[in-house]
């Protein structure tokens, strides 16, 4: 005798295998029958599908759109072609001083030639090339 057969709350399983359905008999409805109380044998239920967008996401989406619009307005305000011209706007802004770009000094050249000598300065050695 099995341990779970001693417990009164659990009914004993049927000792005989289930009979095949007779030709004129319909199968039991899904809520009744052999595997009615066991969740693994019950038919799978569909999860409720959400229709649309929830309120929290909607609020975030709206805030994102407002933020994007603010950024767009700021971008347009910073761009002179999209910004409406005000009188004296160009005269107030002083031109930036332009500095000459850094030129390569000659001191860096011998260092480069030590590691990778040019072919015309190889002093007749042909094995390096």
Swiss-Prot record:
Q: What is this protein called?
A: Uncharacterized protein ADAMTSL4-AS1
Q: Where is this region: Disordered?
A: 1-129
The gene is: ADAMTSL4-AS1
* Biased composition annotated in UniProt, kind: Polar residues: 119-129
Stretches with biased composition (Basic and acidic residues) = 87-100
**What species is given as this protein's source?**
Homo sapiens (Human)
- Lineage, top-rank taxon, reads Eukaryota
């Amino acid at each position: 005798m099995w341990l779970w057969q001693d417990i009164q709350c659990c009914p004993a399983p049927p000792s005989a295998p289930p009979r095949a359905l007779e030709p004129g008999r319909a199968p039991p409805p899904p809520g009744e029958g052999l595997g009615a109380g066991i969740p693994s044998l019950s038919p799978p239920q569909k999860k409720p599908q959400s229709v649309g967008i929830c309120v929290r996401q909607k609020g975030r989406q709206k805030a994102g759109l407002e933020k994007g619009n603010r950024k767009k307005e700021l971008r347009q305000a910073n761009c002179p072609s999209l910004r409406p011209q005000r009188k004296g706007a160009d005269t107030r802004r002083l031109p930036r001083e332009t500095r000459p770009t850094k030129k390569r000094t000659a001191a860096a050249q011998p260092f480069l030639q030590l590691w990778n000598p040019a072919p015309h300065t190889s002093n007749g050695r042909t094995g390096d090339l």
